[in-house]
Amino acid sequence: MVDLSQLYDNCVYSSIAHALFVLKEPFFSASQSWDGMNYSFNDFSGTRGTISFDLSGNILAGAVRSDESEQCNLYPEFKAIELFANAPENVKLLAQKEALEYLYDEADGVTQPIATAAFWSVGGEIVIDEDIEEFKANGGEYLFTIGVSHEELRDYWRGEYDLNNEELAAVDLIYERFKARGAIRSEDVPIIKSKEVQEPKKRGLFGRKQKTVEQEPDGYAECIASLGELGIVIE
């Protein structure tokens, strides 16, 4: 498992890969998102979660809910913050104020945060306070998907999102500029554009030129919005 710093970088890289993916598949725009320093994910199959980072304090708090987990049956009597019982107080506070705020749901008429697995960091090290297999069964599998080396993560998203060479190059460039706090110009990532591209050689009825839409307008908007959540602007 990587440390806090690498996990944060991996979440950023994953989100940039996601932004390029929704350029062509805008329906999945909600599968990854950022709100401040809170990274949220949703697999649309019953598992969702949020990782809240406090980089200045070198801590994070992560909470996940799997609808398939037996832990769900403990609610509403059980309180999600109890998953952080052995965490330091500053981590508990981060979990309560941030991560768990994204997991509100209703159980037997009671609306409260519902989580089935949790993890945190102490001194930058990621801590999982239960058996690894139980943690995965309770919704924690995604942490192991993104908690790998940069090269492994890059290969994972290339395959998962079926990114071609141009798309992957755009992901890498945006990520490198984000890390370096450098500007990104539209000509640096020509694949990200909303206008229709005409192909003169293709003709439809009555000899009219057919239009090929390179990127759907909503896909472009979702891509730009996803990047914007990280403060990334294409000039």
Kindly label every feature range from the protein language model.
Residues M1-G46, L55-S56, Q71-E235:
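N-terminal domain-onset segments
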Residues N42, G62-A63:
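Pocket-edge structural micro-motifs
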Residues N58-L60:
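Primarily extracytoplasmic ectodomains and periplasmic/lumenal surface modules that are beta-strand-rich
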Residues A63-Q71:
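Short, solvent-exposed aromatic-acidic interface loops
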